[in-house]
A protein has these predicted regions:
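Conserved lysine of the Walker
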Residues: 17
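P-loop (Walker A) phosphate-binding loop of NTP-binding proteins
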Residues: 12
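Hydrophobic positions on the alpha1 helix immediately C-terminal to the Walker A/P-loop
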Residues: 20
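Hydrophobic anchor at the beta1->P-loop junction of P-loop NTPases
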Residues: 9
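A glycine- and Lys/Arg-enriched "phosphate-lid" helix/loop adjacent to the NTP-binding pocket
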Residues: 103-182
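ATP-dependent small-molecule kinase phosphotransfer cores
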Residues: 30-132
Length: 230
């Protein structure tokens, strides 16, 4: 049986990852495409509980937490899910994830001085893909929005299970989101990434979820499903 494809939806906070993951799941259901859906971090996991504490500020303000340590929490959460990820892929199902390794790379590297980022990213890639042996993505869809717009949209979100705050530790820091967006832009140069512009700078408006979804689906059809015997 052909191995399934790992499709990841990425972007800074407020980019619309949850919405696009849901729309993609509905599209796959309508098409009869077998798939399994994941969302990281998984706040119910043992590492996820610690991530929630980190995002709630229980370990101190963002600059007080070494990014190597916070990176270990997010990587550990994925490592706990590795068996489920591999089982789904080995059964031939598509795996759709809302965030994956790139989120860790972007958000933790954003807190490292620019001159040290390449070294940090190399270390974290080795940890997640090498030491932990997590499966590599077949396609990463990068939902690109300006940090200021993402920050605004986060404020419109409904309550989340892991925090009572309207914005968690990372979401509340606009400078952090700007730096994370810069790292994402660098990561997006990777061949298996597709960038979807979600904000129309000309009109100053966010594109509709349906417009974005059509572009996401086109990328998946051309880059992944067309090579999987669709």
């Amino acid at each position: 049986m052909p191995r399934g494809k790992l499709i990841v939806i990425e972007g800074i906070d407020g980019a619309g990852k949850g919405t696009q993951t849901e729309l993609l799941a509905r599209a796959f259901q309508l098409r009869g495409v077998p798939f399994v859906r994941f969302s990281f971090p998984r706040y119910e996991s043992s590492f996820g509980h610690l991530i929630a504490s980190f995002l709630n500020g229980d370990f101190g303000p963002l600059p007080a937490v070494d990014p190597h340590l916070s990176a270990l929490l997010y990587a550990g959460d994925r490592f706990e899910a590795k068996a489920d990820l591999e089982a789904a892929l080995n059964s031939g199902q598509a795996v759709v994830t809302d965030r994956y390794i790139a989120s860790n790379l972007a958000h933790q590297a954003a807190r490292v001085p620019a001159e040290r980022r390449p070294e940090f990213i190399a270390w974290l890639r080795q940890l997640e893909y090498g030491t932990y042996g997590l499966p590599a993505e077949d396609l990463v869809i990068y939902l690109r929005v300006p940090a200021k717009e993402g920050h605004r949209l986060v404020g419109l979100k409904s309550a989340r299970s892991y925090t009572a705050m309207s914005r968690d530790l990372q979401e509340s820091d606009l400078l952090h989101l700007k730096e994370a967006a810069l790292v994402y832009d660098e990561l997006a140069q990777t061949p298996n990434w597709v960038t979807v512009e979600c904000f129309d700078a000309g009109s100053g408006k966010h594109r509709t979820p349906e417009e974005i979804h059509r572009e996401v689906l086109e990328a998946i059809d051309s880059r992944v499903l067309s090579h999987a015997g669709k």
